Design a protein with these regions (language model features):
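Short amphipathic
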Residues: 19-25
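Alpha-helical transmembrane segments
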Residues: 13-19, 117
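N-terminal leader segment of winged-helix/HTH proteins
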Residues: 1-9, 13-14
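N-terminal regulatory/effector-sensing and dimerization cores
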Residues: 25-121
Length: 121
């Protein structure tokens, strides 16, 4: 019997299409806050790890290869694993079309992610 992949089943049914997408490179420590928009949100971790939380929910650690699909984005906090509690939120710096950087300008990139908003087909 074939193993059923629940995420693949959901994606097949919803057929989401990216309305907005960007690739973000991050250098620790960093933190991003976003207000809830109510739009479907996705995040794919291409390389590295981070911590993500929606609204007042618990934070979850994401690793390379992890994918998050939120049907209606609430307030979002996403940050490096070593972020001090008092670090203010960073504003992503646009490097080029669809390419952004967050965190220190020096040092190695510790996270690459593809994030954006989507809608059903």
């Amino acid at each position: 019997m074939a193993t059923i992949d629940p995420l693949a089943e959901i994606l097949t049914l919803l057929q989401p299409m990216a309305r907005f997408s960007k690739q973000v490179a991050c250098t620790a420590p960093w933190r991003i806050y976003r207000d809830g928009t109510g739009e479907p949100f996705y995040c794919a971790i291409l390389e590295g790890s981070c911590r993500i939380a929606f609204g007042t929910g618990p934070a979850v650690v994401l690793l390379t290869g992890d994918f998050v699909l939120a049907p209606a984005m609430r307030a979002l906090r996403i940050e490096s694993l070593d972020t001090p509690p008092d670090l203010p939120a960073n504003q992503p710096e646009k490097l080029g079309e669809g390419l952004f950087h967050v965190g220190r300008r020096d040092g190695p990139t510790d996270l690459r992610m593809r994030i954006g908003h989507c809608h059903g087909a």
